[in-house]
């Protein structure tokens, strides 16, 4: 059996896994993505490929209001656990920075939409 050594092994080719792989490659790491299905994209491949990141500069430039307090209330209602509070805040704080990083360092371009297709 042949072996290959990589800096980052990503299990699953959904949006999160592919984003991790892209960032690692941008930062100079060797990456391998393993996906069990014949299609990359995970659930985004069947959901119009949309992501929701409240407070992004892309939405702000398009004049789309997406106040963080409303997003915070929505997430708290959907992920109603004390242990999830830190994760929700991390998402709200870093999500917009991730989109900016990807646009700045790759060919990825995010197109804001007022509503899901």
Predicted regions and their residues:
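Polar low-complexity intrinsically disordered regions
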Residues: 1, 28-30, 49, 102
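Core beta-strand elements of the Rossmann-like FAD/NAD(P) dinucleotide-binding domain
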Residues: 2-6
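N-terminal Rossmann-like FAD-binding beta1-loop-alpha1 element of flavoenzymes
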Residues: 8-33
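Conserved N-terminal/central alpha/beta ligand/cofactor-binding core
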Residues: 36-117
């Amino acid at each position: 059996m042949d072996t290959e050594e990589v800096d980052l092994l990503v299990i699953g080719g959904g949006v999160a896994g592919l984003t991790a792989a892209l960032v690692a490659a941008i930062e100079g790491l060797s990456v391998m993505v393993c996906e069990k299905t014949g299609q990359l994209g995970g659930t985004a491949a069947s959901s119009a490929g949309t992501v929701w990141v409240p407070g992004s500069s892309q939405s702000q430039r398009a004049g789309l209001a997406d106040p963080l307090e409303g997003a915070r209330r929505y997430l708290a209602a959907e992920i109603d656990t004390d242990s999830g509070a830190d994760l929700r805040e991390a998402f709200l704080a870093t999500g917009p920075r991730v989109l900016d990083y990807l646009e700045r360092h790759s060919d990825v371009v995010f197109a804001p939409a007022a509503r899901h297709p």
